[in-house]
Amino acid sequence: MPRSLKKGPFIDLHLLKKVEKAVESGDKKPIRTWSRRSTIFPTMIGLTIAVHNGRQHVPVFVADEMVGHKLGEFAPTRTYRGHAADKKAKKR
């Protein structure tokens, strides 16, 4: 269910401050964050944000198509290793 338009998009204030500081100084270093719930704003375009996936920080380069999505959508938390192979079919 999407967020109410009356409330507006959500972004953690500490992340917003880091983004504004990076844009102001022109710094291209990745911004580390644990805030997967924050919405991507247009001011973040062109920055690399390292989003925590529970184990490590995954670098995400923000493109203009990502605006409006959440940061957590681009840092998968689970690895899919495939279904278990059928041992009977393997012997044939």
From Swiss-Prot:
PROSITE patterns in the cross-refs: RIBOSOMAL_S19
Any GO molecular function: rRNA binding
GO biological process: ribosomal small subunit assembly; translation
A GO term from the CC aspect: small ribosomal subunit
Top-rank lineage group of the source organism: Bacteria
Keyword terms of this UniProt record: Ribonucleoprotein, Ribosomal protein, RNA-binding, rRNA-binding
Gene3D superfamilies listed in its UniProt record: 30s Ribosomal Protein S19, Chain A (3.30.860.10)
Family: Belongs to the universal ribosomal protein uS19 family.
Cited function: Protein S19 forms a complex with S13 that binds strongly to the 16S ribosomal RNA.
Protein name as it appears in the record: Small ribosomal subunit protein uS19
Source organism per UniProt: Sodalis glossinidius (strain morsitans)
Gene of this entry: rpsS
